[in-house]
Amino acid sequence: MFLKATLLLGLAVLGMHVWAIQMEFVDISKDLDYFVVSVEFAVAWFNSDNTEEQAYKLLEVRRAQQKSWTMIYLMELDLGRTICKKHDEDIDNCPLQESPGERKVNCTFIVDSRPWFTQFTLLNST
């Protein structure tokens, strides 16, 4: 009986370990459609949450990862302050600020994406 209980406990621990490994973030293509939309959401969220008047735009995607078997994306982004205001249109084509106030930031976001519902949730940001 003790041997069976030990074996069962060992299998349960092994199963949890395998499940945890499968739920880790893995590298993905930066061009993956749902990832790109999630990046746009993260940049828009950054601009709306930021107290500055100027808008920031995407400069570079440093890291693109997805949690296995989910639509949860981890992204590390470089953003640059533009000369445009937050609510201006076409911020992507707005020039970067080139003055002593020039500012570039590196941010990490975790976004839960449900694009078929047009629903995105920011789970974490730094």
Swiss-Prot record:
One of its GO terms (cellular component) is extracellular region. The keyword DNA-binding does not apply. SMART domains: CY. It comes from the Eukaryota. Keywords: Disulfide bond, Glycoprotein, Protease inhibitor, Secreted, Signal, Thiol protease inhibitor. Gene3D superfamilies: 3.10.450.10. Its main location: secreted. It is found in: Secreted. GO terms for molecular function: cysteine-type endopeptidase inhibitor activity. Glycans are attached at residue 106. CDD domains: CY. Residues 1-20 form the signal peptide. Disulfide bonds join 84-94. InterPro entries: Cystatin_dom (IPR000010), Cystatin_sf (IPR046350), Cystatin_spermatogenesis (IPR052333). Belongs to the cystatin family. This is Probable cystatin-16. It comes from Bos taurus.
